[in-house]
Amino acid sequence: MASLADRVRGNGRIAAGLLFNLLVSICIVFLNKWIYVHHGFPNMSLTLVHFVVTWLGLYICQKLNIFAPKSLPLSKLLLLALSFCGFVVFTNLSLQNNTIGTYQLAKAMTTPVIIAIQTFWYQKRFSVRIQLTLIPITVGVILNSYYDVKFHSLGMVFAALGVVVTSLYQVWVGAKQHELQVNSMQLLYYQAPMSSAMLLVAVPFFEPVFAEGGIFGPWSVSALLMVLLSGIIAFMVNLSIYWIIGNTSPVTYNMFGHFKFCITLCGGYILFKDPLSVNQGLGILCTLFGILTYTHFKLSEQEGSKSKLVQRP
């Protein structure tokens, strides 16, 4: 009876964690878009706020023994911290200059680009069926972008840069975690302050600092509260992702990611009144089909590899 109660409590915690991640992941997209549309807060400055709040949050977490920091050589993290800056800045610029649907769908191109990077630079091999799933993903993104009535050429440039830098960042994070034998929170504990310092130097060259429209310019209390809330929610997204990965299976994590993908798309069209044509709808369905089949094949191949290792004498 006790074990049943423990299982129920455990499942309840997982359900609560998934629900929390769903809320904050969707909230951060809509809140950032709201800040850009209604307050015009500068992009790099908002990213800087996110990094600083994330580092402060991680500092509090390590003081509460949620994770143990590990001493790491800063020289080995410079490129990773720089790519972290680029990944968040370009992703936010894509959100600022595109509809939420186009922004969200463009992010799906990260998978094909990661596969290309790992194939050409790391000589990693992928099965034919995995490679074939990249076709509907790519076709769907192109369809959606081509028929987007709010198509913004600069926005697509930012989206493309965001995809490339995000893909590099994700590949390098995996490599660094393996090389340095650290988890994502231990790595982020060093990345966040390093990336903050880099942006602190870069911001004055690209954005006004004390003038109107700058981070220290005259802002309303509501705008500043929204920016601070955005930073706190960004930290909560990182923390909840770490918790989900540690407490659920890869299948749960991936399937839940697809659910968030669909909810964010629908929310963007409802909240921001973004027009949706039939061809865009087909593009979204095409991309979603590609993502789902990719996940199915990838997870089945991973399970097959594990079973072979178990059977090996």
Curated annotation (Swiss-Prot):
Membrane topology qualifier: Multi-pass membrane protein
Location (main, coarse): membrane
Entry-linked InterPro entries: Sugar_P_trans_dom, TPT_transporter
Location within or outside the cell: Membrane
Keywords assigned: Membrane, Transmembrane, Transmembrane helix
Highest taxon in the source lineage: Eukaryota
Record-annotated membrane-spanning stretches: 17-37, 40-60, 71-91, 126-146, 154-174, 187-206, 225-245, 252-272, 275-295
Keyword check for Protein biosynthesis: no
Primary role: Putative transporter.
Family membership: Belongs to the TPT transporter family. SLC35E subfamily.
Identification of the protein by name: Solute carrier family 35 member E3
Organism: Mus musculus
Upper classification of the organism: Eukaryota, Metazoa, Chordata, Craniata, Vertebrata
Encoding gene per record: Slc35e3
